[in-house]
Amino acid sequence: MKLLRYGPSGQEKPGILDAAGRIRDLSAHVPDLAGDVLSDAGLARLRAIDPATLPLVSGEPRIGACVGHVGKFIGIGLNYADHAAEAGMPVPKEPVVFGKWTSSICGPNDGIDIPKGSVKTDWEVELGVVIGAKCKDVDEARALDYVAGYCVVNDVSEREWQIERGGQWDKGKGFDTFGPIGPWLVTRDEVPDPQRLDLWLEIDGHRYQNGNTRTMVFTVAQLVAYLSTCMTLQPGDVITTGTPPGVGMGVKPSPVFLKAGQTVRLGIEGLGEQLQRTRDAQ
């Protein structure tokens, strides 16, 4: 299934894409795509519904983040060896974990706000993993059983705040609008191998990132298992799993960063695309 949330910010309704790619309304069946709705049992109930029996959503509504009430938004850094190289950092021996504030979450096509005074706002196309069941101390072999599905994430990052101003990465990762998620939550039964997905990103039509999740340092299963040892993962938690090379700070001979008025387009094979315009934060 390709599940989504649509409507004005803060008033999103749950929906599903039908076979023709049209949005059907699910709000008579579930209040949101969150919590227990993301469990295997909850998704099975949605799967049993014939989309043709659901109300058709008219027009072109805003698409929100594909999961609601996110408890934890967990980032993984330097998870592609070639990205670590372009960043001038060693390939990690254990996952590099940081937090993205949930207030950074926005829809896949919402605008990206360039923070006041920022000259180093950067892009990162990433595979997002949505947890579907409470998960603590799980084995790698069973880790994917706790995944509800997958989505596209743009891990927007302000490099000066992230790297140059001391402290943790978190403060450069969590500005408002720095977490576009979606358009769809694609359930795990439709993604048989999350380590075989092409991902890409363009700025103003120029392709900067081309990668495949097979080159991850730590697989999705390894990340879920690892994170479950240091925290309890809950339904609706989102893990964004790192980016391939091609970010702005790695461009040679001189880095390239986002400015107001640009168009960011990105996508992952089978998971849909995002399209954002950049603007100065007010």
Curated annotation (Swiss-Prot):
Q: Which Pfam families match?
A: FAA_hydrolase
A single MF term (Gene Ontology): ureidoglycolate lyase activity
- Biological process annotations from GO: urate catabolic process
The record's InterPro entries line, in alphabetical order, gives: FAH, Fumarylacetoacetase-like_C, Fumarylacetoacetase_C_sf
- Work out whether the entry's keyword set contains Magnesium: yes
Q: Which cofactor does it need?
A: Mg(2+)
Signal sequence: where?
Answer: none
According to the UniProt entry, what is the EC number of this protein? Answer: 3.-.-.-
Keyword annotations for this protein, in alphabetical order, are: Hydrolase, Magnesium, Metal-binding
What is this enzyme's class at the first EC digit? hydrolase
Residues given in the record as Mg(2+) binding sites: 124, 126, 155
Q: Which family does it belong to?
A: Belongs to the FAH family.
Q: Could you tell me what this protein is called? A: Putative hydrolase Bcen2424_5521
- Species, as recorded: Burkholderia cenocepacia (strain HI2424)
Task: Give the source lineage, highest ranks first.
Answer: Bacteria, Pseudomonadati, Pseudomonadota, Betaproteobacteria, Burkholderiales
